[in-house]
Each structure stands twice: as C-alpha cells, then as structure tokens.
Amino acid sequence: MNACVLSVLCLLGAVAVLVEGVTVQDGDLSFPLESVKQLKDLREVQEPRLASHKKFAPRLLKPVAPQLCSQSAFPEALRPLCEKPNAEEILQRLEAIAQDPNTCEICAYAACTGC
C-alpha cells in the first residue's frame, strides 16, 4: 500500500514538472524555454538580411532587439524584455540558449530551472 502511494506521488510530481516546463531566467525576468527556442527561428529568418548589410556597411547596423521585438512572430512571453534598456544583451544570452536548447533541458546553464 505504501509503495503504491509513493509511486503515485512520484508520478504526480513528474507530471507537475513536465507541465510547468523549463524556465530560463535572466536577472528579474523569466521565460519559458519554448519561447526562447522560437528566437532561433526568428533569427534565421533575419540572418540573410543582416548578413548582406554587414558586407556593405558594418557600422550602420541597427540594434537587433528593436527589429526582433517588432516582428509579429516574436513570442509574447518575451515581450517584457523589449522594454529593458539592456534588451540587446538579454537577447544575446537567450539566443545562446536557443542555439542549443538541449543543454538547458538538462540544466547545464545556471539560468535554466525546472528540469
């Protein structure tokens, strides 16, 4: 009987962790890992345009944060970072996680919780 109750509690705990998912935290902001993963797709769409500009006028490049934040496909959960003065830096850190989200899923990054 006790083993059955313990098994059910463990199963419920595992389900709770899976439902909540992995959270990425940067300072006072926290984001679902799934939203962070979407940055990679947005960035890949934007890369060809940025690469062509880099060849001709590397000094004229605009910050990436306003461009990403203005896209309609930008994840809603990440919108609060667009208001931050250091949004560019935050996006760079989140994009590093988005490039290899598996390391976050196993909590290799200190910023990832909920594994």
Swiss-Prot record:
Source organism, top-level taxon: Eukaryota
Which keywords label this protein? Disulfide bond, Secreted, Signal
Indicate the segments annotated as coiled coil, or none if absent: none
**GO MF, one annotated term:** guanylate cyclase activator activity
* Propeptide feature ranges: 22-100
Q: Which cysteines are joined by disulfide bonds?
A: 69-82, 104-112, 107-115
Which residues, if any, are the signal sequence? 1-21
In the UniProt record, does the keyword ATP-binding occur?
Answer: no
The record's subcellular locations are: Secreted
Name the family.
Belongs to the guanylin family.
Q: What does this protein do?
A: Endogenous activator of intestinal guanylate cyclase. It stimulates this enzyme through the same receptor binding region as the heat-stable enterotoxins.
The protein, known as: Guanylin
Q: Which gene encodes it?
A: GUCA2A
